[in-house]
């Protein structure tokens, strides 16, 4: 099952990023396969590629955290087997680029990791408890390994702990 993926580019920096739609589809299809998720027949998600200012506003509004982060997920909250709209993933260019550089990882690989991580939140995974975090990270490693991407947790990224929790509430600002 392949969901419909709506892509919105809300920051000029992403204009040079080669084919985000294909990367998103590849990562999400592999994540569905590895997780065994059963989605609604007409499942749909949106991915917003934005800048730090855009995501900082969302982070402040929905999480009460007054700074940018790498990715936010906005799950719709319904059962994934019957809910057509799974939710939204928002990825910030500057933070993602900085983290990739600091970790010595290719930018595209880090974006792939954030797409997988964000999508797992949309289908019900979280990392609030240690056991849940371990299971989620193991699944991310497996997905990325299948795509030929190195283990994203070899070196911890500063924003992974403070920015990847699912967010409750609608993301109306990008669905205009």
From Swiss-Prot:
Q: Which NCBIfam families match?
A: rRNA maturation RNase YbeY
Against InterPro entries, the record matches this protein to: MetalPrtase_cat_dom_sf_prd, YbeY, YbeY_CS
Tell me the SUPFAM superfamilies matching this sequence: Metalloproteases ('zincins'), catalytic domain (SSF55486)
What species was this sequence derived from?
Methylocella silvestris (strain DSM 15510 / CIP 108128 / LMG 27833 / NCIMB 13906 / BL2)
User: Among its keywords, does the record have NAD?
Assistant: no
HAMAP family this protein is in? Endoribonucl_YbeY
**Major subcellular site:** cytoplasm
| Gene this protein is translated from | ybeY
Tell me the protein's name: Endoribonuclease YbeY
Q: Which GO terms describe its biological process?
A: rRNA processing
| Cofactor annotation | Zn(2+)
For this chain, the family text in UniProt reads: Belongs to the endoribonuclease YbeY family.
Q: One short Pfam family name for this protein?
A: YbeY
Give the location in the cell.
Cytoplasm
Q: Which UniProt keywords apply?
A: Cytoplasm, Endonuclease, Hydrolase, Metal-binding, Nuclease, Ribosome biogenesis, rRNA processing, Zinc
Keyword Zinc in the entry? The reply is: yes
The GO cellular component terms are: cytoplasm
Free-text comment on the cofactor: Binds 1 zinc ion.
Q: What positions does the entry give for Zn(2+) binding?
A: 117, 121, 127
């Amino acid at each position: 099952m392949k969901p419909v993926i709506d892509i919105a580019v809300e920051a000029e920096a992403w204009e040079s990023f080669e084919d985000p739609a294909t990367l998103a589809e590849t990562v999400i299809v592999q994540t569905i396969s590895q997780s065994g998720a059963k989605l609604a027949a007409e499942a749909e998600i949106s991915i917003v590629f934005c800048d730090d200012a855009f995501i900082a506003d969302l982070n402040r509004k929905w999480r009460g955290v007054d700074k940018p982060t790498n990715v936010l997920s906005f799950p719709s909250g319904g059962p994934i087997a019957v809910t057509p709209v799974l939710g939204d993933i928002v990825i910030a260019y500057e933070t993602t680029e900085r983290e990739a550089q600091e970790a010595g990882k290719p930018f595209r690989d880090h974006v792939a990791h954030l797409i997988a991580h964000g999508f797992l939140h949309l289908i019900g995974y979280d990392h609030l408890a240690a056991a849940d975090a371990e299971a989620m990270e193991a699944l991310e490693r497996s997905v990325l390994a299948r795509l030929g991407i190195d283990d994203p947790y070899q070196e911890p990224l500063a924003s992974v702990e403070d920015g990847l929790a699912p967010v409750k509430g609608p993301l109306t600002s990008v669905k205009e």
